């Protein structure tokens, strides 16, 4: 499986056994000015997350794209 990986947001081949792509997002102290923090990567299973953290998992190549928001 190929997934987008942060910090470079490049498509990379996942290690053997890691066939799930994920997009994890959450707010930090800069959320109001910068938006949510985003973490992209590969996993063997969909990661469990703490309350307040959003996770989306998928299992096809490059199914976790992220387009950075534009500053005005």
UniProtKB/Swiss-Prot annotation:
Keywords: Acetylcholine receptor inhibiting toxin, Disulfide bond, Ion channel impairing toxin, Neurotoxin, Postsynaptic neurotoxin, Secreted, Toxin. It is found in: Secreted. GO terms for molecular function: acetylcholine receptor inhibitor activity; ion channel regulator activity; toxin activity. GO terms for cellular component: extracellular region. Its main location: secreted. Belongs to the three-finger toxin family. Long-chain subfamily. Type II alpha-neurotoxin sub-subfamily. This is Long neurotoxin OH-17. The lineage of its organism: Eukaryota, Metazoa, Chordata, Craniata, Vertebrata.
């Amino acid at each position: 499986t190929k997934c987008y990986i942060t910090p470079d947001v490049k498509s990379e081949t996942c290690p053997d056994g890691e066939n799930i792509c994920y997009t994890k997002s959450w707010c930090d102290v800069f959320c109001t000015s910068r938006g949510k923090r985003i973490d992209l990567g590969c996993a063997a299973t969909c990661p469990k997350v703490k309350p307040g953290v959003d996770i989306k998992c998928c299992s096809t190549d490059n199914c976790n794209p992220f387009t950075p928001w534009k500053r005005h």
